[in-house]
Regions:
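Membrane-interface extramembranous regions
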Residues: 1-135
């Protein structure tokens, strides 16, 4: 019988696809401009690449282990990206225009909000969004 994954585990697989996809985009011709910026906005370095690869790999591991491990992944991811947004935003407050600062941070803002929302609401035992019991 095939293994059944809870909704939060499926979300973790989705985040794995997102992060591993961003990692792989670095190696697609035409995505990076002459200044090394992805889509002309996002500076991608080896450290950033490793961060995306690590976040995607940890998402797969959390999803495969259990719903509880996937939930821990989302809490840690939310905290990590919240710290990232605050430090980047504050560090670049007087270096780049406010609008560009917000736009550059928008993917990470959406990720930490989604991660906290998933960790706090998806697949909780006894909730309406729970499709399987948490392991």
């Amino acid at each position: 019988m095939p293994r059944q994954f809870s909704t939060i585990q499926k979300c973790a697989f989705g985040f794995a696809a997102l992060f591993l996809g961003v990692y792989l985009l670095d190696y697609v011709p035409g995505i990076m401009d002459a200044n090394g910026l992805m889509f002309g906005l996002f500076q991608m370095t080896s450290i950033v690449d490793l961060g995306h690869l690590g976040a995607g790999t940890l998402a797969v591991i959390g999803a495969l282990i259990s719903a509880r491990a996937a939930r821990v992944y989302f809490w840690v991811l939310g905290v990590w990206y919240l710290i990232d947004v605050v430090t980047y935003f504050a560090g670049h407050l007087h270096k780049i225009p406010l609008t560009k600062n917000i736009l550059v941070n928008m993917p990470h803002i959406l990720i930490f909000i989604a991660a906290f929302w998933i960790a706090s609401t998806v697949s909780l035992p006894g909730s309406e969004t729970s499709s399987n019991k948490e392991a």
